[in-house]
Amino acid sequence: TVNLYLRNSWYHNTIKEFIRRGEIGDLAIIRICHMTPGLAPGEGHEYEGPSFHDCGMHYVDISRWYAGCEYKTWHAQAIRMWDYPEPWWLQCHGTFENGVVFDITQGHVYGQLSKDQTHNSYIDVIGTKGIARMSHDFKTAVVELRGVNETHRIEKPYGGKNISTLCDLFADSVRTGVFNSRLPLMRDSAIASEYAWKFLDNARRNE
């Protein structure tokens, strides 16, 4: 689950390479937002849990992927829409063990019945010297990189689920007999699932 499209996406890999080159200084803050009309309760998410587990665990994973560290503290709040027993919007902020701060907002409550539907999906990666950010509308992704030496604005097709990239990485591992480091471990999926549930549980405890 965690590798289908976010870890394989051109935009996240572009941002991570920019960070690796030291262009934003030390990584300090990761802000992710993914709000869409999405699926309403009863339309598919319940098989894998509430919206934040079924969909939100992708963002739990990608935040950890950027931080390169484990979650340390968190505080979550959520809202139940339409009198449904499970929350369909959740916001969680906290820290990683290395001091990096995170903020994840995810929900499928973004105007289901609006005449012209829209989305609000982005990531802000803030360092001690520069920033990298991305936004998309499921058709086009725009990456903006503002570092100490380089400034770029890259606009490309969004890329969908990137299953072809996943297949290529797996095939490379089979062909060479060496596990491709861009592939996650099963442990990564388990951790993403575990913390998505922890954040949901924390939200239930908070007003």
For every predicted segment, state its role.
Residues E150-G159:
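C-terminal "lid/loop" region of Rossmann-like NAD(P)-dependent oxidoreductases
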Residues W10, D54, N120, K161, ...:
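Residue-level signal for the nucleotide or nucleotide-sugar donor/cofactor binding architecture
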Residues H12, Y59-V60, I163-A171, S193-W197:
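A general structural signal for well-ordered alpha-helical segments in protein cores
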Residues E97, L169-E207:
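C-terminal helix-rich "cap/oligomerization" subdomain common to oxidoreductases
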Residues T1-N3, H75, L183:
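Short catalytic-loop micro-motif centered on adjacent basic/acidic residues
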Residues E46-P50:
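Short glycine-enriched, charge-decorated loop/helix-capping segments at active-site entrances
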Residues V60-T140, P157, T165-V178:
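Contiguous beta-strand/loop segments that form the cofactor/metal-binding neighborhood of enzyme cores
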Residues T1-A40:
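A contiguous active-site-proximal alpha/beta segment in oxidoreductase catalytic domains
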